[in-house]
């Protein structure tokens, strides 16, 4: 894949199951070396770190950076023994952060309860104009056309709820069309179209014609 000039490759990572998902982490001397080089060459006025609690590039950047820091928190969970044990080590570094952002109420509550701080709630931004334009371009539906339900997400993560959706569809007796977008294992389900990974343009086109987005 051709990457933009502003993207710096971090190197190999290994997967770790966490909170119903899979986190990919990089550890080792190369992480510290790359982070220091990135910060030095960038000469940033402000460094914005995502998930500073993650023991990889983010936490390393938090440890070595000297200038103003902003952090965005995405994760949430019910409990974490690892985070509890790491708290004495983490808190001094987290105190370097001048501005915190949480993308959801749960992420904010998790950060406040587990590690302190007072992040501002700012949900992830979505450029809706792309989808609004796709909606306008979508052909008008006739009164007898089936309702279209669209799912977008990773298929193999239980927390995304795909299997719950597929189970619920068995109880629907109306004429519907179901399109599933996302990477992972497709299921053999009658009346359900698994299209796999799609481009941004394809995603906008499919969402543009949807009646229900899950």
Report residues per predicted region.
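N-terminal strand-loop element at the rim of the active site
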Residues: 1-30, 184
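N-terminal subdomain of nucleotide-sugar transferases
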Residues: 1-3, 40-43, 67-68, 95, ...
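Short N-terminal targeting/anchoring amphipathic segment
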Residues: 35-56, 70
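Acidic donor-binding loop of glycosyltransferase active sites
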Residues: 44, 208-214
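Nucleotide-sugar donor phosphate/pyrophosphate-binding loop at the beta->alpha transition
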Residues: 56, 68, 75-103
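Carbohydrate-associated surface elements
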Residues: 106, 125
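Conserved donor-binding/catalytic core segment of Leloir-type glycosyltransferases
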Residues: 140-160, 166-171
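Conserved active-site histidine-acidic residue motif and adjacent donor-binding/catalytic loop
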Residues: 183-186, 192-208
């Amino acid at each position: 894949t051709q990457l933009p000039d502003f993207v710096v490759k971090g190197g190999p990572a290994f997967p770790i199951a966490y909170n119903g998902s899979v986190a990919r982490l990089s550890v080792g001397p190369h992480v510290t070396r790359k982070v220091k080089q990135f910060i030095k060459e960038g000469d940033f006025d402000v460094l914005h770190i995502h998930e500073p609690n993650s023991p990889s590039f983010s936490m390393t950047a938090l440890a070595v950076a000297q200038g103003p820091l902003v952090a965005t928190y995405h994760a949430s969970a019910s409990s974490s023994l690892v985070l509890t044990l790491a708290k004495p080590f983490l808190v001094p570094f987290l105190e370097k952060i001048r501005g915190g952002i949480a993308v959801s109420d749960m992420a904010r509550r998790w950060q406040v309860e587990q590690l302190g701080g007072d992040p501002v709630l700012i949900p992830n931004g979505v450029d809706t104009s792309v989808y609004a334009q796709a909606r306008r371009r979508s052909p008008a539906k006739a009164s007898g056309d089936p309702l279209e339900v669209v799912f977008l997400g990773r298929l193999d993560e239980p927390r995304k709820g795909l299997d719950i959706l597929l189970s619920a569809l068995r109880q629907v007796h109306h004429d519907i069309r179901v399109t599933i977008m996302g990477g992972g294992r497709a299921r053999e389900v009658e009346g359900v179209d698994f299209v796999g990974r799609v481009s941004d343009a394809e995603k906008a086109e499919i969402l543009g014609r949807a009646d229900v987005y899950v």
